[in-house]
UniProtKB/Swiss-Prot annotation:
SUPFAM superfamilies according to UniProt: Glucocorticoid receptor-like (DNA-binding domain)
Organism: Leptospira biflexa serovar Patoc (strain Patoc 1 / Ames)
Binding site for Zn(2+): 24, 27, 40, 43
PANTHER family per the UniProt record, alphabetical: 30S RIBOSOMAL PROTEIN S14, SMALL RIBOSOMAL SUBUNIT PROTEIN US14M
Protein name (database record): Small ribosomal subunit protein uS14
Protein keywords: Metal-binding, Ribonucleoprotein, Ribosomal protein, RNA-binding, rRNA-binding, Zinc
Gene Ontology molecular function, alphabetical: rRNA binding; structural constituent of ribosome; zinc ion binding
Purpose: Binds 16S rRNA, required for the assembly of 30S particles and may also be responsible for determining the conformation of the 16S rRNA at the A site.
Cofactor note: Binds 1 zinc ion per subunit.
Cofactors demanded by this protein: Zn(2+)
Gene that this sequence comes from: rpsZ
Subunit-level organization: Part of the 30S ribosomal subunit. Contacts proteins S3 and S10.
Record keyword Cell membrane present: no
Length: 61
């Protein structure tokens, strides 16, 4: 989990557009963010294994 201070800082309007970055809305993680699903890889993996994300299934080959 991200610190509460980091979450509050992210919510503020940035002075420059370049400083904006994506953060997972579920856990607050800023790294390994998947834009397509709007969450980090850890939350994505957890929800996908519980079959809570429609259209996602485990691949095997």
């Amino acid at each position: 989990m991200a610190k509460k201070s980091m979450m509050e800082r992210h919510a503020k309007e940035q002075k420059f557009k370049v400083r904006e970055y994506n953060r997972c809305p579920l856990c607050g993680r800023s790294r390994a963010y998947l834009r397509r699903f709007d969450m980090c890889r850890l939350c994505f993996r957890d929800l996908a294994s519980k079959a809570q994300i429609p259209g996602v299934k485990k691949s095997s080959w």
